[in-house]
């Protein structure tokens, strides 16, 4: 799933922490920098520019208020993709965890600037797991169909997401 996980993480952060809290921690502005850049964090503002860059996605992972954030994330992915068999790829997760030094740097910088509420290693564990979920193009097409239909599954007619979150 890698970076597509960022969209699910944002949805879950909005559902569990609310709009105001989530966007007090991460902005909504585009950036012309690389997805893993920290340049703007130091130059412009203490908040990541948006939830679709690594710094922003780490923050949205921290904004998920649940006893088991990754389990909540996985349940949401399964629901929105209409596939109860979606799961974590343990090898990808271990690789992300082992090689995620830049993301570690970002998380500790965010913690030092009081953007992260949680402990960096705990937040990163959730983030690395999110990025390591395996799904198919068909799964993601179903998810896109729900987003394009303002949160309603057109196959079942069931509202799966509030329209204002979409």
Residue ranges and their predicted role:
Residues 54, 100, 134-137, 163:
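Electropositive phosphate-/nucleotide-binding environments in soluble metabolic enzymes
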Residues 2-11:
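Active/ligand-binding-proximal structured segments within catalytic/core domains
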Residues 134-152:
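Active-site-proximal alpha-helical segments within enzyme catalytic domains
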Residues 6, 66, 158-159:
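Short N-terminal secondary-structure initiator segments
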């Amino acid at each position: 799933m890698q970076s597509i996980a960022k969209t699910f993480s944002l949805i879950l952060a909005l559902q569990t922490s609310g709009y105001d809290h989530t966007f007090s921690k991460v902005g909504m502005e585009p950036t012309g920098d690389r997805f893993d850049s920290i340049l703007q964090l130091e130059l412009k503002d203490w908040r990541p520019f948006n939830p679709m860059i690594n710094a922003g996605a780490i923050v949205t992972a921290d904004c998920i208020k649940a006893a088991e954030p990754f389990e909540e994330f996985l349940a949401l992915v399964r629901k929105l993709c209409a596939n109860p068999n979606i799961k974590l790829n343990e090898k990808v997760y271990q690789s992300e965890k082992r090689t995620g030094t830049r993301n570690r740097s970002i998380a500790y910088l965010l913690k030092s600037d009081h953007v992260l509420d949680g402990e960096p290693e705990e937040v990163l564990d959730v983030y690395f797991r999110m990025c390591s979920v395996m799904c198919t193009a068909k799964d993601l097409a179903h998810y896109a169909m729900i987003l394009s239909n303002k949160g309603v599954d057109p196959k079942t007619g069931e509202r799966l997401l509030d329209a204002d979150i979409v």
